[in-house]
């Protein structure tokens, strides 16, 4: 296997914008976690090579807890890139690059909640299809 870098896509980091946690009942071992991840893309005005992924993540077992999180990932495209490659970067690569940071945040947060949830390690997510594009304001 050959491993290389992708010089045309730069990841500039993730910011956690909002976290809402609600404990409903004492945690038990029979927790059945449901994860919903909804990424959207935003292209800032007058910055042709910049895009952002807004990711809403819900993790819950409605019997015990609900965790809602919103994060934003910052990305930059370098050079002349064909439209099909740009589309793949935006719709597949960027959310896949960003998600492990969000996942890690959730694990760290729940580890520090004590016995409220136990430490949650949510499964990896796979991204396919076109992201909803948020309007430029």
Question: How would you name each of these model-derived features?
Answer:
Residues 1-97, 104-137:
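N-terminal intrinsically disordered, cationic/polar leader segments
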